[in-house]
Each structure stands twice: as C-alpha cells, then as structure tokens.
Amino acid sequence: MTKLLVSLAVTCLLTYATSRAEDKPVPAGGQSLLAENVEAQLKLGAPKDSAEMGLVPVKPHAGQPFSQAVRVRTIVRPQRDYEVQLIAPSVAAVTQGDVCLLRFWLRAADTTHESGEARARVYFQKASSDWHKIVDYAASAADQWKRFDVPFVAGRSYPAGQAALGVALGYKPQTVEIAGIRLLNFGRGVRIADVPRTKQTYAGSEPDAAWRAEAEKRIDQHRKADLTVRVLDAEGKPLAGADVAVRMKRHAFGFGSAVVLYMVASPGEENDLYRKRIFELFNRVVNENDLKWPAWESQWGRPYSKEKSIAALKLLREKGFYVRGHCLVWPAWRHVPGELQKLKNDPAALRKAVREHIVEETTATKGLIDEWDVMNEPFSNHDLMDVCGKDVMVEWWKAARSVLPEARLYVNDYAILAAGGDTATAHQQHYEETIRYLLDQGAPVGGIGLQSHFRSPTPPETVWKLLDRFAKFNLPMSITEFDFPGDDEELQARYTRDFMTAVFAHPGVDGFVMWGFWEGRHWRPDCAMFRRDGSIKPNGEAYKELVFKRWWTDADGQTAADGAYKVRGFLGDYEVTVSSDSLRKTEAAKLDKPGSTLTVKFGGT
C-alpha cells in the first residue's frame, strides 16, 4: 500500500553553489513538456513511513532560476530505488526523433552515503506499463547546488499526459533537494550537439588514477604467462640464431556478444556482414532471444525456429566459438509460454512442464553449447517459485545436469555491478543469498552471471569490491550482457575501456560478453559499437584497441645460445614460425598458466 506523505515544514534558507561542465546557452524555442512550477505538481509515492516530502524556500542567488525546492527525506531504504519516487505528468506531446533537454538542480541536505553525496535517478518515461524510459539519468551531489543538463533524442512518441517525469530516491537514508526542473522539446530543428550537456564522470576516470597501475599488475599476473620456444637442429642440439615469429590467434579469455541466431543461419548481404563482424571480433557468443523458451517453441513467430537456431549453433561450433545458451528458465509468466499459466494452481504439473522443457532443449542442443544460463533474473522474476516453492530452482539445475554432465550451468542477474556505484542493494543481497541457497541445496551451479546493463558508471574500484564479494563462492564469474548508453559517446568509450580493464584484471572473471554490437540489432541501439551504416563508434574503437592491441601478443626474435626464445604473452592460442637458413616450420602453441614450452625440431626424427 503506497501512501503519500507530505510535510510542508519550512526550513532554513540555503546558500548556493554549482559546477557546470558546459556554458552553452539553451536553444530558443523549446516547448515545455511539464507544467509551469512543476515542483509544486510533483507527487511522492513511497511505502508507509519510508519517506516524506515538502517544499522549502531557497535564498535567491545570481544565475539561480528558482526560489523554492522540493525536499524529500528517505527514511527507510526500499528494495528498489523507484519505490520512493516523485512523479509529474507531461502536458505536451513528444514525437520520436525530437531533440529534448532535461535540466534540474540537486543538492544533499543530509546523507548517510560514504561519498558524502545524495543520489537521485531522474527519467522521462511512459506513464503506464512497460514504463519505457526515453531518458534515464543517475545524478549525485554534495551539499552545494549542482546543475545537470541532459540532452536526449526521443526514442518513442507519447501524447500529452501519456508520459511522466520521474525522480527515484529510494537509496540509503538521505535528504535531497531538487529544483529548477525543466524538460524542453526542440523538435527536430536543433542539433543535439548544440544543446548543453553535463559531462558525467566517475571516481577513477582520471588518466593517472591509482587503480590503473594496480590493474596492469593484475593483468600481467593473471592474464599473461611465459612462452618458451626451444629450437633444435636435426641432431637434437639447441639451435642458436633461429628466427622466431610468435603470432597470437585467439584469447583464452572470452570476449563476445549476444547474436541473433536466425541471422547467423540465414543468407543475405546484411547477414553476411553480420557474420563477418562476429567472426572478426569475438571468440564467444550468446544467443539474444532465439533459445528463450517462447522463441524456441516458435511462439514469437517467424523468423524464430529450432531449425535455424541449431543450424547457427553448428556453424558457430565449426568456427571454434565458445557458446553460451540463454536461458532455460526465466521464471515469470511473461517470459514463459502462455499455456503454463493454466498450471498456476497445479504445482506438480508446473514442475513437470518446466523440467520437461529443460531436458528437451538441452538434449536438442547438446554438444553445441558450452554453458547455459539455467535461471535468469530471479530477483524480479519469481512467479514459478511462488507457485512451486523456491526448492524448484534446485530441480532445474539437476534437470540440466542430467543431460549435460560437463557444461557450466550459470545463474544470471542484473543490477549487481550496474547499480550506480551502490554496494548494498536488496538486489545484490538477494543474488548472494540465492547463490548460497542453491549451493547449500546441492544445485550444480557452475558459474555466476553478472549482466551489467549500465545506466551510469560504477567506479572501477567499486567493480572490484563487488566482484570480490561474489568471488567468495569460488565459481567462475562472467560479464554476460554488458552495455552502456551512448548519448555521450566519449563517456561511453571511456567507461567501456575502464570497465573492461577492471574485469580483465580480476582473476575470478573468465569472460566479457556485450548484449549486441550493431545498432541495427540492439535492444538499446545507442549502446552498440557499430552504427546502422556499419561505421564504428568510439566504444568500438576502445574495444578493438584493448582486445587486439594492448592485450594481444605478436613478437619476433631469435633463439639464444641455448636454442630458446622467450616471450611473455597473453594466454591463448598462437602460431609460431621458426626459420633458419632455408628451413622454415610453423606450429600451433597454446599458452596456459603457469607457462608453456614449444619445442620445434628441424629434420631428424
């Protein structure tokens, strides 16, 4: 039951300070999407006794366009940040493609967060289910007023009243003030580059941040080893002065993307280019939708089919890809075939139906998939557990293991690393407790999936802290669904580089998989590495720079007097070519921990 708690107590007058990243003027002609004096129109929704709201006066100051602010005190932190939420409906229409500006001012009157800042997530969303957000911005501020300018292009159209401004405030106990709220629509007559923007930053983004040196040490320790090439002559004696060329061919660490299996399996110029990019960029893939239960049963219509999915999986296997399957059970009614709802009053029959599905799909794809997400997003999706009891989760793992004795069987969830820098959310705690329960009950959990759909940056050292928390289970961890918004492409590239570096430096992580790479097939198109026309974005350049340059080993040299050539390289597969006079030999090598030796002999037996 939600109760609106309003307190109109007048508090002391406030002083003013702000920091601006840009001083661009606001373009003329913008239409307001919100009512005049919207602060007075905002309504608070919150669980009983968890928050209170009031209007407070603000001491006038030059350049400050407001004389009052909305003050919200979060008393008890709810499970989800939007459970303490300010809402104001739109009063004008927005059309897909319109250039808009969200502007607001924020300060912390009081906070218990260790950063000394208060937090708010401000968004403009559909006013009904599915609450799609056109813009979603995480902000934080200390005790001085800070202005935020957030330009965006509307991705959907909504008539007046069918969208709403929202401010989520369900964080650690804090008192936050927000003022000067404006939401302007410039239509298509203004370039987004001409609209002011607050440059986002995050702790550790500095080029000389201390964590970077630590990351390099960890990467050298955990992702590299010594490769020794020993060259012998026909008599088996060490051959000095031989030329050695070491060429890396494939990372041991998994770098990958979600892919559309029916596109991988289908002919056509666009699909040819799609496959080409996959083969060039990745050594690991996961299906985006094709293997989800309704798609697997062709309930989402063409072009999904078991035949195309299996054909694509066979091609990927031929090309040497490590393949993730996603997902056997997404335990909410909206994510399973509709007929299962008929069994909501029959737990035994529901258990049987899910068990049979797991066995059928894993049997059909056996030998083609290396690891499965057995269960996806249990924090937000638990209808099946509500009917059957939470012990049914253990049954799902055991059903998968009965068919797949060697595959890694993952649990997967979101908002663990991508929690706005928070390390104490109900979602994180639930995930930890779920993993512990599964292991205690004997479920053969083989890995921990961390989706990583970001809206705002989590500082790299906070990423390490969270990874350490889940590393205690001694299971491989994988980044399974990374994406980061691209409204600021420079920030997108910078954070992609830093996040990848942080996870590559952590010994418990064995893979980094993004949730799509091409704008033409991406659930969040601005997150893609390649634009619709095929051109690469800065985040794509950052990915390639790391994976194929900074973390890639190609080396040339000569054998020493003992016939050996040594190089420290990144773990993975190599091609080694040795030449001496007119003799030449090429052999494959695999560089593992703690190191590998390849012996190349010319002539003889």
Kindly give the residue locations of the regions a language model identified.
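Extracellular and organelle-lumenal recognition/adhesion modules and their flexible linkers in secreted
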Residues: 22-256, 272-276, 303, 326, ...
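Short Pro-Gly-centered beta-turn/loop motif in secreted/extracellular proteins
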Residues: 266-281, 566-573
